[in-house]
Regions:
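Conserved Radical SAM active-site core
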Residues: 2-143, 150-154
Length: 154
């Protein structure tokens, strides 16, 4: 132990989430809580360091290349659906549809991944869930897990 402590474990600014997911628990929190509870992180560094799940929508090419270059693994990905149009709708982000391309880049580089789906009845269940499971299964063995979590209200 060198006795050095940093104000932030990342030593620079955290990357906040740019999505407005229809199921986001942070957006459902009551007012008047401490500020840190309202911060929505979507930072690949926190995925590696602390196991946080990220949507990949904040990741630019240089961010993806950094993960690959330094083999920051595993990375935990909030997928929700592999249907590009539906993913854009669920995340309220018109740029969210390229998740399979990004996962493919990590796969080709041997980056280990875990994924999750927040299951919303009538949206990403049934055939859409089957499609997502099938699509993500193509990335085995580097796609190590898929968690399916039912949507909840806080």
């Amino acid at each position: 132990d060198l006795g050095i402590t940093f104000e932030s474990s990342l030593m620079d600014e955290y990357h906040s989430c740019c999505n407005k997911c229809m199921f986001c628990f942070i957006d459902q929190m009551p007012p008047g809580m401490r500020d840190t509870l309202y911060f929505k992180d979507d930072d690949s560094r926190l995925s590696f360091l602390q196991g946080n799940y990220i949507t990949l929508t904040n990741m630019r090419d240089k961010d993806i290349e950094r993960v690959i270059k330094y083999h920051l693994s595993p990375i935990n990905i909030s997928v929700h659906t592999t249907n590009p149009e539906l993913r854009c709708k669920m995340l309220h982000n018109r740029f969210a549809g390229d998740v399979l391309d990004k996962i493919g880049r990590f796969y080709e580089a041997g980056i280990r991944m875990n994924s999750q789906v927040v299951l919303c009845q009538g949206l990403n269940d049934e055939e859409e869930l089957d499609r997502t499971i099938s699509d993500l299964g193509k990335f085995i063995p580097h796609m190590e897990s898929l968690s399916v979590v039912p949507v909840g209200l806080t």
